[in-house]
Amino acid sequence: STAFKGIGGSRFFDEYEQEDNLKSEVTGILCATCDGCEVCWNKNQAILSGEINSMIKAVIRHEKKDTIIDNSYVQRCKKYPKMVEEAINAFGRMEVNKAWYKRLLDNRTVIAQQLDAMTKVLENWSYDRQNIDITKQFARAKIKREALECGIYVSEIHFYKTKEERIIITSWIKSENGGVPVKEFLRCCEKITGLRLRLQKECKGILAQEMTEVTIYEDVKYYVLTGFSGQKKNTSMVSGDNFSMFDTDEGAYHICLSDGMGSGVRAYQESELVVDLMEKFIEAGFETDTAVKLMNSAMVLKGESDSFSTLDLSSIDLYNGKLTMIKIGAAATFIKRKDEVTIVESESLPAGVDIEQDIEKITKNLKNGDFLVMVTDGVIEYLNVRNPQERLGAIISDITTDNAGVLSQKVLDKVLLDTGGYVMDDMTVLAIGIWEK
């Protein structure tokens, strides 16, 4: 990707080179075909050159055509109005070319980022899991024998260890007569390994007579319960906020919240795209920061300069409770531990503004009974206090409940009390509680 980024380099010039190019183009078209060219340039070259430079600078400042003509920057030229018109046209072409070339550079940057992303995915596949069949030969044989007693034939079984020292078991199995629950095989593996295990997300419930691939993971320590409350802007038909909550086989739970610019259908479509891209990238195996970069580059190349969306991504490792947050133009997040609330903020531009978006990861540790509260800007912005983040933190702290749904609804209700019940922007409140199994 480094070599790819280096191809070509920038072909656009600084301000002085831009002036020279415009000057050369204008004089090449008008002066070269003018009968008075020799008189003007031989007798008054220094003066004429300075006057044309002043006119060119006015064009670059985007002054109006009539204003430039009235200022008479070039006093001795009978074709001065035509010269101004030609300079404006030439500058317009130069700006268009510059914009298109920037898009090409952005495309090249995106492709380089995609190459980097694919490299990371391949590296993760190479180093994330290590085959340990040799050290698990006895366990593999016992699982095959135990499964056979349950009517399950095991064709292949392999043990892997992740970089976090967790066990993954992959197998090809079938039921001789069909109709055996796959959980029977899970119980066989738990009995032999002495570990608490779980099946992959997309796993058949009943084994058939055909071979089926089954992957088993070490079970996680925590589970989550979630709640959602929201209101659309009073003058809108639909909320411009979107969110998604999903877990992965690797034992992570992801919450993705996006607030589209403005409100209504356009904002909804933009935030929906952000959430959809993030979910697909993460489920495809990309790390969260890489997924954010790919999503951002897609939004930049979408090419709509006034269409941006925020991204608030929280990922919880259900093995150890580690929380990782990435905020792209998003509102503050609140972590509630009993009656104490921690406010997490980050300043960054919304998605789609800059192709080289800075990605900052914020990490916290969650414990049994903690709540994560994520909101969009509409929940905070219209609290009529000097520090709305602290006000919302106090609201969350005062609520006593172990129910995520109740927490999210009470937060929204109390915010609406502060705004007099009027919803001036789309409001979304997500509450995620983490509990030990």
Region spans (language model):
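N-terminal entry segment of metal-dependent catalytic domains or homologous docking segments
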Residues: G205-G260, R266, E272-L273
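PP2C/PPM family metal-dependent serine/threonine protein phosphatase catalytic domain
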Residues: E218-N242, N296-K302, A331-T363, D413-L417
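A short interface-forming secondary-structure element
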Residues: I169-G178, A330
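Acidic loop->beta-strand submotif enriched in PP2C/PPM serine/threonine phosphatases
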Residues: S236-A252, L311, I343-N384, G420-G421
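Active-site-proximal, acidic helix/loop segment immediately C-terminal to a metal-coordinating Asp/Glu
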Residues: G260-A284, E347-S348, L366, D370-T419
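Catalytic core of PPM/PP2C metal-dependent serine/threonine phosphatase domains
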Residues: N131-E164, E184-L186, E190-M211, Y268-K338, ...
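Short beta-strand-to-coil "C-cap" segments at the C-terminal boundary of structured domains/repeats
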Residues: Y217-D219, I432-K437
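Intracellular, membrane-proximal regulatory regions of polytopic membrane proteins
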Residues: S1-A141
